Amino acid sequence: MKPAWMPPNKMNMLYRTVIFSTWLFFKIFYRHRVYGLEHYYTGGALLAANHASYYDPPILAISWPEEGHFLAREGLFKNRWFGAFIRAVNSHPVSGDASDISVFKTICKLLSEGKKVFIFPEGKRCHKDELDKLKPGIGMLIARTKTAIVPVYIHGTFDIWNRRRKFPKLWGKTACVFGTPILWKDFAHLDKKQAQEQITLKLERSINELRHWYEKGAKGPIP
């Protein structure tokens, strides 16, 4: 048994093993579903999702059919063995007091190499089960790299493991919905500031539309 979407040769062996084990966990306990893989984007891109839970990063990773990259607190790399492990599954250290510029440069480098970077543009886990205001930096990243954003809606994690819960429920239902990529070329005619603002607004609308699509029964074309 394996995810139907898992390709034969787009993941290194360790990453693939971790992804499969995690997918199995979410499939058994949370009946995890994936929608919108017809919106798969070739080349460097940000995959930008709502953020309600510690479960969101693994759900995003198991739902996308190729390797993705995360930014992680530098302190997590201090242990030799754990640090080696999370590096092997594509986590990149960022200092707790790192400037936005250092984070920006790390993401730009990954995108320029044609990689997918998983991010949560709210900047933190939400307090309520709704999308918080997005940080403006995501528009700047796309304007700088001329790449794309794939909007993502993650369902179910707020109820299972939100900020008020010390431990997750071992039941529930999760889903991950990928939307139509947001392309730089559609904003290239605007001046830089306008483009950044419009990209951020478009992403916010897209994530909310994906949620609406899912909650209305997950039927019809995915926006």
Annotate each predicted stretch with a short phrase.
Residues G36-Y40, C108-K109:
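Short amphipathic alpha-helix with an adjacent loop that forms part of the alpha/beta core around
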